[in-house]
Amino acid sequence: MIEIPSDLHPDLVPLAFLLGNWAGAGVSDFPGAEKCNFGQEVTFSHDGRDFLEYVSHTWVLDDEGKQVRPLETETGYWRIDKDRKVEVVMARDQGVIEIWYGELADQKPQIDLVTDAVARTAASGPYSGGKRLYGYVKSDLMWVGEKATPEVELRPYMSAHLKKVVTPEEVAEMARNLPDMPDDGIAFFK
């Protein structure tokens, strides 16, 4: 069930399904990078203004689902307009800042995003842009990300299945049962 806080800015009601603390596991696989399972914690929060604050922490998991090392941290701000157009400003610890645009689907809690602008530091490594799909399915938050570099065309590179605040043991169990990422990257949306 989706709860709508009484102090949520009215413009954000369509994004209320994102609110809360989420945790789970996913798969990362991209040419030139380590293929791994990862754990993830995501928080979507609000303070009454017309945006959601987003923070995501990921870490590499071993075969038993235990944390090995940090993978990536993202932080950002999500907005939606009256036409269900979504905009996201995001910064990553790897030295990348992105502006994403997309929209909330009609009649279902699903958001498709694509990068509009990317700025990166020299240390960040190659990155040209990406796409993301977020969906609220049976009270879980699922997402798949695609990215492109000058050398690699746009392709899936990460996907995750998140539940509202779960224990570390539940995250480990989810990680042990993850399938490999399929070629189309839509591991959790079929």
From Swiss-Prot:
<dbReference type="InterPro" id="IPR014878">
    <property type="entry name" value="THAP4-like_heme-bd"/>
</dbReference>
<dbReference type="InterPro" id="IPR045165">
    <property type="entry name" value="Nitrobindin"/>
</dbReference>
<comment type="similarity">
    <text>Belongs to the nitrobindin family.</text>
</comment>
<dbReference type="Pfam" id="PF08768">
    <property type="entry name" value="THAP4_heme-bd"/>
</dbReference>
<dbReference type="InterPro" id="IPR022939">
    <property type="entry name" value="Nb(III)_bact/plant"/>
</dbReference>
<protein>
    <recommendedName>
        <fullName>Ferric nitrobindin-like protein</fullName>
    </recommendedName>
</protein>
<dbReference type="InterPro" id="IPR012674">
    <property type="entry name" value="Calycin"/>
</dbReference>
<feature type="short sequence motif" description="GXWXGXG">
    <location>
        <begin position="20"/>
        <end position="26"/>
    </location>
</feature>
